[in-house]
């Protein structure tokens, strides 16, 4: 068995290696949504492909990468997110239930992508209790967040959790999408980006 941390390192190294071969590192957009099975994305050709097509996600899959052999290490929100972020199983990273947390300094995906020369951002549902401090930029829902009229936490002058932006008239999906589009428009263009875009 290969430890998850090593797999995460190998994947990061592979992306950096590809970038050095072709002279330019690829931008990376990681989209996550809660309870979203692969067969719900028509690019995978599942039973829902004709009933509920996903043409925009299909286009992204065609132009980028489509994981054909990926596994969820935990079936609930916080632990699953912690595994992706740390590259570790939950019994190692400590996030074993919905009260899970990943402390700054252990948010390895953000740290390693930053070391590889990427501008890192986390936008949307975080649900890991503590500040996503290892990202260059973040704009995250507090806890599970609200579906309608959400607030998001941002980095600012006040302590973690006190710097908020409210979206009283929006659904969380629209607010998260708008925040991501604004960040993509305003970000530093001289660096490639690694963006974790998480829906509720």
What are these regions (language model features)?
Residues 1-3:
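Short, Lys/Arg-enriched N-terminal segments with co-localized hydrophobic residues
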């Amino acid at each position: 068995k290969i430890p998850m941390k090593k797999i995460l390192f190998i994947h990061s190294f592979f992306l950096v290696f590809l970038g050095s071969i072709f002279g330019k590192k690829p931008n990376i957009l990681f989209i996550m949504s809660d309870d979203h099975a692969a067969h719900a994305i028509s690019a995978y050709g599942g039973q829902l492909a004709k009933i509920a097509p996903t043409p925009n996600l299909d286009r992204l899959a065609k132009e980028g990468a489509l994981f054909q052999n990926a596994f969820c290490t935990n079936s609930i929100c916080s632990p699953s997110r912690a595994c992706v972020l740390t590259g570790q199983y939950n019994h190692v990273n400590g996030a074993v239930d919905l009260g899970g947390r990943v402390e700054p300094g252990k948010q390895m995906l953000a740290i390693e992508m930053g070391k590889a020369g990427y501008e890192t951002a986390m936008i949307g549902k975080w649900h890991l209790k503590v500040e996503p401090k290892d990202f260059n930029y973040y704009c995250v829902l507090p806890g599970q967040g609200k579906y309608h009229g959400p607030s998001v936490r941002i980095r600012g002058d006040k302590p973690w959790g006190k710097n908020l932006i409210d979206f009283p008239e929006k659904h969380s999906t629209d607010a998260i999408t708008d925040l991501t589009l604004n960040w993509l428009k305003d970000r530093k263009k001289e660096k490639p980006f690694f963006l974790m875009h998480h829906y509720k």
